């Protein structure tokens, strides 16, 4: 596996991986915003099914809004991919109260993808806990055990938001419960310390050169008349949050 990954990386002029963790195999894909990330990972599922027969996929997203957008993308592109591959992916949004869909996901040999937001399995509420509970309505089984038994392929959309900065937070720990075959991480802005086994990079300049985006705008700031004896302002950091963006000025 390592040699195959290294060959792909060298062909793409990316830094080759020195080692891999086969117990937690992750591959990083960097794609500039607006270049078709969702389309790409849907096509990746079809190709993995075509080449290797893998049929169980889970897309993990950071919010309900993104979850709904991904679900809509599957609906919109359904005909396109069906025409190309001659089959359809059965997609559904995870709901702790609709357990029959999990049974279908696990037992059906066709391609299935479950779309789930982090709050549905990593929050502290009762709904989030149901996935780890033996449920009478589910023949005294735990939904997570049924899902994990399929050895799904995890696709993490916007991992910098899904995983967060804390290396031991609840989301990271709970993701291990899915026991994935491997994990694909798709984003334009990966956290530097979460980049592992980069196999594809489409940055802003590449996207512009390939005419996938219209233009790149860069704003410069010049300082005039400075004698270097006075204080000065500099951008210390940009703080990302669910609210308005904030910058820290030093």
Q: What positions do the PLM features span?
A:
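RecA-like P-loop NTPase motor core of helicase/translocase proteins
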Residues: 1-250
């Amino acid at each position: 596996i390592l040699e195959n990954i290294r060959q792909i990386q060298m062909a793409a002029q990316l830094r080759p991986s020195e080692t891999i963790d086969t117990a937690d195999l992750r591959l990083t894909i960097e794609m500039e915003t607006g270049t078709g990330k969702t389309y790409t990972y849907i096509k990746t599922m079809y190709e993995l099914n075509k080449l290797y027969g893998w049929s169980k996929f889970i897309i993990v997203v950071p919010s309900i809004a993104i979850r709904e957008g991904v679900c809509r993308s599957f609906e919109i592109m359904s005909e396109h991919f069906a025409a190309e591959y001659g089959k359809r992916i059965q997609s559904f949004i995870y709901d702790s109260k609709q357990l029959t869909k999990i049974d279908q996901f696990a037992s059906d040999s066709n391609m299935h993808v479950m779309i789930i937001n982090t709050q549905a399995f990593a929050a502290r509420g009762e709904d989030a806990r149901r996935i780890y509970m033996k449920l009478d309505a589910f023949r005294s089984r735990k939904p997570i055990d049924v899902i994990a038994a399929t050895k799904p392929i995890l696709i993490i959309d916007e991992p910098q938001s899904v995983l967060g900065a804390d290396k031991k937070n609840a989301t990271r720990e709970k993701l291990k419960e899915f026991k994935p075959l491997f994990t694909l991480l798709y984003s334009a802005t990966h956290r530097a310390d979460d980049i592992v086994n980069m196999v594809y990079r489409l940055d802003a300049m590449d996207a512009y050169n390939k005419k996938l985006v219209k233009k790149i705008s860069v704003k410069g700031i010049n300082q005039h008349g400075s004698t270097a004896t006075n204080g000065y302002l500099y951008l210390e950091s940009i703080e990302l949050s669910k609210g308005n963006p904030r910058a820290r000025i030093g």
